[in-house]
Amino acid sequence: MSQYFTLFRIEPAFDIGTENLEQTYRALAARFHPDKFASASAFEQKQAVMMSSTINDAYRTLKNPIDRAAYLLKTSGIDADAPEHTSFAPDFLMQQMEWRETLMEARAGNNLESLKNLDNEIRAEQEKLFCGLKQSFARQDCDTAAQQVRQGRFLDKLRHEISSAL
């Protein structure tokens, strides 16, 4: 299941070097670009399209820390995104409500400064979460990592909503 890591010749881990990931992606994308197989057989063309799609999926997954963490958990048989794993700690739920309220008020008042401040706050929370994920994986604490992935999904979604409002 660590196919994406194998494809990019990276040891399966949460903490990976994104520079190497980027370089390997460019090399693989160029090598398997479907246009290079324009004069090849239909089978080879189809294989190139499938490989190109896999390369793109792998890159997107490994580049995003939350997607990478979820993928790592799946390699251990844990689906952090499964519907039965949607609970959050009470303090995180309270914080979510506060952030949502701040977002709604900033949108309603078209307050760009509040939106930017909220975005900075969420970005800082994401950085703390990434450090926590690194520690969870180092301790092989998959349950905590799964909870952190769910929190990260929420933070990603909230940042997307903030970006849309800006």
Curated annotation (Swiss-Prot):
<comment type="subunit">
    <text>Interacts with HscA and stimulates its ATPase activity.</text>
</comment>
<dbReference type="InterPro" id="IPR036869">
    <property type="entry name" value="J_dom_sf"/>
</dbReference>
<dbReference type="InterPro" id="IPR001623">
    <property type="entry name" value="DnaJ_domain"/>
</dbReference>
<dbReference type="GO" id="GO:0006457">
    <property type="term" value="P:protein folding"/>
</dbReference>
<comment type="similarity">
    <text>Belongs to the HscB family.</text>
</comment>
<feature type="domain" description="J">
    <location>
        <begin position="3"/>
        <end position="75"/>
    </location>
</feature>
<dbReference type="GO" id="GO:0051259">
    <property type="term" value="P:protein complex oligomerization"/>
</dbReference>
<dbReference type="Pfam" id="PF07743">
    <property type="entry name" value="HSCB_C"/>
</dbReference>
<dbReference type="GO" id="GO:1990230">
    <property type="term" value="C:iron-sulfur cluster transfer complex"/>
</dbReference>
<dbReference type="GO" id="GO:0001671">
    <property type="term" value="F:ATPase activator activity"/>
</dbReference>
<dbReference type="Pfam" id="PF00226">
    <property type="entry name" value="DnaJ"/>
</dbReference>
<dbReference type="InterPro" id="IPR004640">
    <property type="entry name" value="HscB"/>
</dbReference>
<dbReference type="GO" id="GO:0044571">
    <property type="term" value="P:[2Fe-2S] cluster assembly"/>
</dbReference>
<comment type="function">
    <text>Co-chaperone involved in the maturation of iron-sulfur cluster-containing proteins. Seems to help targeting proteins to be folded toward HscA.</text>
</comment>
<keyword id="KW-0143">Chaperone</keyword>
<dbReference type="InterPro" id="IPR009073">
    <property type="entry name" value="HscB_oligo_C"/>
</dbReference>
<protein>
    <recommendedName>
        <fullName>Co-chaperone protein HscB homolog</fullName>
    </recommendedName>
</protein>
<dbReference type="InterPro" id="IPR036386">
    <property type="entry name" value="HscB_C_sf"/>
</dbReference>
<dbReference type="GO" id="GO:0051087">
    <property type="term" value="F:protein-folding chaperone binding"/>
</dbReference>
